[in-house]
Amino acid sequence: MARVTVEDCLDQVENRFELVILSSKRARQLSNGAEPTLDWDKDKPTVMALRELAENTINKEVVMSDPDTPPFFG
């Protein structure tokens, strides 16, 4: 289990605020049974979401394409 840093994730998203929104929405999806794109390794959903963002296996379009996910801003 590798440590995930904010800097690793910021290479894939525009800013810290977008990172918080996307990672929290993805963590919620994982908690509700969404299929992870990486090996789980006993991580919590929040860590898994950050790992997926850092590894660029998911992006904004993937997270927001879930019909149960509310609009990004407003």
From Swiss-Prot:
The protein's name in its UniProt record: DNA-directed RNA polymerase subunit omega
Function per UniProt: Promotes RNA polymerase assembly. Latches the N- and C-terminal regions of the beta' subunit thereby facilitating its interaction with the beta and alpha subunits.
Leading EC class: transferase
SMART domains the record matches: RNA_pol_Rpb6 (SM01409)
Cystine crosslinks: none
Domain of life: Bacteria
Entry GO CC: DNA-directed RNA polymerase complex
Keyword annotations of the record: DNA-directed RNA polymerase, Nucleotidyltransferase, Transcription, Transferase
Gene3D superfamilies: 3.90.940.10
UniProt-recorded Gene Ontology molecular function terms: DNA binding; DNA-directed RNA polymerase activity
Annotated catalysed reactions: RNA(n) + a ribonucleoside 5'-triphosphate = RNA(n+1) + diphosphate
NCBIfam families hit by this protein: rpoZ
Family: Belongs to the RNA polymerase subunit omega family.
Cross-referenced Pfam families: RNA_pol_Rpb6
Keyword field contains Nucleotidyltransferase: yes
Entry's EC annotation: 2.7.7.6
GO terms for biological process, alphabetical: DNA-templated transcription
SUPFAM superfamilies for this protein: RPB6/omega subunit-like
Quaternary assembly: The RNAP catalytic core consists of 2 alpha, 1 beta, 1 beta' and 1 omega subunit. When a sigma factor is associated with the core the holoenzyme is formed, which can initiate transcription.
